[in-house]
From Swiss-Prot:
Gene Ontology terms for molecular function: acetylglutamate kinase activity; ATP binding
Family: Belongs to the acetylglutamate kinase family. ArgB subfamily.
UniProt protein name: Acetylglutamate kinase
Species this protein is from: Mycobacterium sp. (strain JLS)
Site annotation Transition state stabilizer: residues: 30, 247
Catalysed reaction equations from the record: N-acetyl-L-glutamate + ATP = N-acetyl-L-glutamyl 5-phosphate + ADP
Binding-site residues for substrate, renumbered to this chain: 65-66, 87, 186
Amino acid sequence: MTAATHTKAQVLAAALPWLKQLHGKIVVVKYGGNAMTDDTLKAAFAADMVFLRNCGVHPVVVHGGGPQISAMLKRLGIPGDFRGGFRVTTPEVLDVARMVLFGQVGRELVGLINAHGPYAVGITGEDAHLFTAVRRDVMVDGVATDIGLVGDVEHVNTEAVRDLIAAGRIPVVSTIAPDANGVVHNINADTAAAALAAALSAEKLLMLTDIEGLYTDWPDRNSLVSQINTADLTELLPTLEAGMVPKIEACLRAVTEGVPSAHVIDGRVEHCVLVELFTDEGTGTKVVNP
């Protein structure tokens, strides 16, 4: 046996405690950032989801599509804007977001996963009443600001997702959803992932980002934290960069509503999901209750 083979065996053996802990459990993964634009990282992420499924873990993927939406808006000559970390969504922007999220980003990820077998099924928040949206404002410099057809999750109906899990499938969720009156809204994927994780009683929520984890004093690289509780994180929230706010709010929401832990992980690391779930080191910041 070669040294490399022995090392592989040790890695697999070391993963056993985590495999036992997660067997039969649901893990919600928010897929976004560089992991969804780099071909190598995209393929690695898809393989990670199939690995989890074949180890008896139930992955549920919720994906964003910000860069792809921005690219299509530019291509179509439609202006786009962000406020408070959220995209301002006019009816024209919503049409593009709806098309790109389900018709492009979701289709690509489903295809990558299904290259390994008949696993992934794409759905949106509109399907089987998965999400009911409620229009939301965001705080910009302390002022409540309207950002158009952007919703929060008012209600989650998990039946369709649970049916897919029971059938051995990997749900791939696009975050477009109607409100109670049928008006369709764009829901931030971080927000939707947290709501779905809580409703499914998931064991973990993983948030892929383009940084190593949570910095308490950005840009000081020494301020990276490996674990933080919800009380400390709530105090820290007003000081964070706008782009991190939806992700941290999502972690707080998930853990507060019963998910044992939420993890902000570095999606630029190949196989980051497996590293976070099945090794001592992990790749980012773990959020837990005090």
